[in-house]
């Protein structure tokens, strides 16, 4: 499960910041927090990974918004507020469970839509159109001009149902 979690961290950050490098950096941060099994400040993480504190904070705050890292707030002896970050098995379980729940909901909606109507798809750009939309557009994709193809719903529903069953086991 740790590998799946690290993949989610890497891809989420890479997508948000439009930078595969940031994604790899976020993966290193999460991996280090998990392996050390202790709460660390953002300054300490930056020093251990030899990266800037600003980058570390940006990554950690984004991961916090996605509930991919845990954060604890405490007051120091000199009354400063200090945040410490951690990753444990519970965080990983919640992160993967949340992603699986979202995927299940979307797949269920897609299965429901496929059972309720007929669909056509463009072979080039893979846009999906309902029967009414395909008729209104004359059976031609408005994006690329290719002829729309009928989607065999039963086959697609079976594939999606198998994926849904696997996700429900998580």
Swiss-Prot record:
Q: Cite the Pfam families for this sequence.
A: TFIIE_alpha
Recite the UniProt keywords alphabetically: DNA-binding, Transcription, Transcription regulation
Q: A biological process (GO) annotation for this entry?
A: transcription initiation at RNA polymerase II promoter
Check the record and name the InterPro entries matching this protein.
TF_E_archaea, TFIIE/TFIIEa_HTH, TFIIE_asu, TFIIEa/SarR/Rpc3_HTH_dom, WH-like_DNA-bd_sf, WH_DNA-bd_sf
* Domain HTH TFE/IIEalpha-type, chain residue ranges per copy: 1-93
Q: Which domain of life is it from?
A: Archaea
MF-aspect GO terms: DNA binding
Domain comment, in the record's words? Answer: The winged helix domain is involved in binding to DNA in the preinitiation complex.
How does the record describe its quaternary structure? Monomer. Interaction with RNA polymerase subunits RpoF and RpoE is necessary for Tfe stimulatory transcription activity. Able to interact with Tbp and RNA polymerase in the absence of DNA promoter. Interacts both with the preinitiation and elongation complexes.
Its biological function? Answer: Transcription factor that plays a role in the activation of archaeal genes transcribed by RNA polymerase. Facilitates transcription initiation by enhancing TATA-box recognition by TATA-box-binding protein (Tbp), and transcription factor B (Tfb) and RNA polymerase recruitment. Not absolutely required for transcription in vitro, but particularly important in cases where Tbp or Tfb function is not optimal. It dynamically alters the nucleic acid-binding properties of RNA polymerases by stabilizing the initiation complex and destabilizing elongation complexes.
Entry similarity comment: Belongs to the TFE family.
The protein, known as: Transcription factor E
This chain's source organism reads Pyrobaculum aerophilum (strain ATCC 51768 / DSM 7523 / JCM 9630 / CIP 104966 / NBRC 100827 / IM2)
Instruction: Recall the taxonomic lineage recorded for the source organism.
Output: Archaea, Thermoproteota, Thermoprotei, Thermoproteales, Thermoproteaceae
């Amino acid at each position: 499960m740790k590998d799946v979690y690290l993949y989610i961290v890497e891809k989420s950050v890479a997508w948000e910041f439009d930078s595969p490098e940031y994604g790899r950096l976020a993966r290193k941060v999460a991996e280090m927090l998990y392996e050390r099994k202790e709460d660390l400040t953002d300054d300490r993480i930056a020093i251990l990974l030899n990266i800037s504190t600003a980058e570390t904070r940006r990554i950690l705050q984004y991961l916090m918004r996605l509930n991919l890292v845990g954060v604890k707030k405490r007051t120091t002896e000199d009354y400063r507020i200090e945040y410490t970050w951690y990753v444990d098995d519970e965080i990983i379980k919640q992160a993967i469970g949340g992603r699986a729940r979202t995927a299940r909901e979307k797949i269920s909606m897609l299965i429901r839509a496929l059972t309720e109507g007929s669909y056509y798809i463009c072979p080039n750009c893979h846009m999906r159109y309902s029967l009414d939309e395909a008729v209104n557009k004359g059976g031609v994709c408005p994006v690329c001009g290719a002829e729309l193809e009928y989607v065999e719903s039963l086959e697609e529903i079976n594939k999606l149902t198998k994926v849904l069953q696997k996700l429900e086991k998580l």
